[in-house]
Amino acid sequence: MNLEELKKRQEKIRNFSIIAHIDHGKSTLADRILEKTETVSSREMQAQLLDSMELERERGITIKLNAIELNYTAKDGETYIFHLIDTPGHVDFTYEVSRSLAACEGAILVVDAAQGIEAQTLANVYLALDNDLEIMPIINKIDLPAADPERVRTEIEDVIGLDASEAVLASAKAGIGIEEILEQIVEKVPAPTGDVTAPLKALIFDSVYDAYRGVILQVRVMDGVVKPGDKIQLMSNSKTFDVAEVGIFTPKAVGRDFLATGDVGYIAASIKTVQDTRVGDTVTLATNPAAEPLHGYKQMNPMVFAGLYPIESNKYNDLREALEKLQLNDASLQFEPETSQALGFGFRCGFLGLLHMDVIQERLEREFNIDLIMTAPSVIYKVNLTDGESMDVSNPSEFPDPTKIATIEEPYVKAQIMVPQEFVGAVMELAQRKRGDFVTMDYIDDNRVNVIYQIPLAEIVFDFFDKLKSSTRGYASFDYELSEYRPSKLVKMDILLNGDKVDALSFIVHKDFAYERGKLIVDKLKKIIPRQQFEVPIQAAIGHKIVARTDIKALRKNVLAKCYGGDVSRKRKLLEKQKAGKKRMKSIGSVEVPQEAFLSVLSMDEE
């Protein structure tokens, strides 16, 4: 194509994404748009078409991003090129959302007509506003009996401050309002503004590993043109690759002769590892590089850590291969080998958050058939030592000797909890119990309140979300972002079985809660660990100080069963003999710890 045609084509491009809270109908709306523009034949259509991972469908969440090109002939007779970039809506994947939004000029904000605005809707809207996107509100699910579109319209205007007078009332499920949405995209979403003649700049917003072609980059071209045969360079690490193929997705990959400014598509350049291609990085040409990269790229750091161990120790290498394969598609997953006396060989893994951790664990078990034991999740603590050094510790077993520690700082998050008014008391009580500090509270409408707390991340990692849902009958929605590190009175608690430390059961706890936490755990373990032939003491210790103890009584055989009557000294001899045997057993015996014991430590609470 010559320059004129390229510029004309650029004016017809519309890049947009759909943002919504979980379950407000985002994937269904995407399905309808694909049907309406006849991108996918009705034979190939299946629900949640863009959620290609089995797990995404099952949980009804979007994890990986997908970008699709559609052609739409508008009422003005012109054919427009739409690029729909699907985003995950969950708090763990916020960075993924922000990158996919950076690849767009507009965003469709889907709000449920019955539920109204939720915490994650807000979080994602602010990301879209940060990226200067044109936001089009849509009120979805208007066919529900509980729908109240007018209330939601005023809510959008009051809480977010968007003009919702032209918000389309739609039902993605019933296919109502889809055409108006498409027309609004043409009118409201601006065309891409880049310069075709400038040096190439393309934003990587995702990367997928393909066994035959290596890493395939999903990119949005901001300036310039890229075609097969070009030599590209990644700006964060200056590595260069030769482009083998470029193309677009119509969910299937379709090769093209070039990608020009405004296009969203893929580049295959036989790149070996996803580690080279960080999401948010800028691709440019090695021969004529851009002067500076696109802004907004940041290295994603894991917030939550846990040990993963295969239940069968001979599966260790399989687990490593499985983690490496997952890492190919998920650069935010980090892992390194670690060993535990209790669990053998395994890996210490870092995750973006709890959902991310859950999803990875489930994919390992499901796609790679590896049964796992997972240790208690922990966060990164900053430990300041008495000699002036400081260190980051994410694994309780690596904590230095308590006498060498001056202070420990732990990460706090700013948690936004949206909840109906009647549950505010329950939410505040929960947040206080989790050592939260109240920040502020705003009324969204007559009934809903946005409560903001500063809560230690370590408290959220355990079971905050489940507790929040159960104390508010499922009505609360929750979003968090890391705010700062603060000094806290933290101690490391060890669990001893039969006098031996079980390293996998160690955890970090606040000093004020140490006693009750220790007592709870030893009582819980007492119920779970099967009785042995000898008595087993279970102790919770901080340093050398035992704070809680309970004993599992020994199983004993009735050695007197065959003495009918008879001399008492005969009975005593048999009992003494049994006692000596138990004693010897105790000194050499080891205790089997069942898997539930590790899990029970995770679900610690005042049950």
From Swiss-Prot:
Residue numbers binding GTP: D23, H24, G25, K26, S27, T28, N140, K141, I142, D143
Entry's Gene Ontology cellular component terms: plasma membrane
Known catalytic reactions: GTP + H2O = GDP + phosphate + H(+)
Compartments in which it is found: Cell membrane
Record-listed E.C. numbers: 3.6.5.n1
PROSITE patterns: G_TR_1 (PS00301), G_TR_2 (PS51722)
Coiled coil stretches, renumbered: none
InterPro entries: EF-4, EFG_III/V, EFG_V-like, EFTu-like_2, G_TR_CS, LepA_C_sf, LepA_CTD, LepA_IV
Disulfide cross-links: none
Domain of life the protein comes from: Bacteria
HAMAP family with a match to the protein in the record: LepA
Name recorded for this polypeptide: Elongation factor 4
Species name: Streptococcus pneumoniae serotype 4 (strain ATCC BAA-334 / TIGR4)
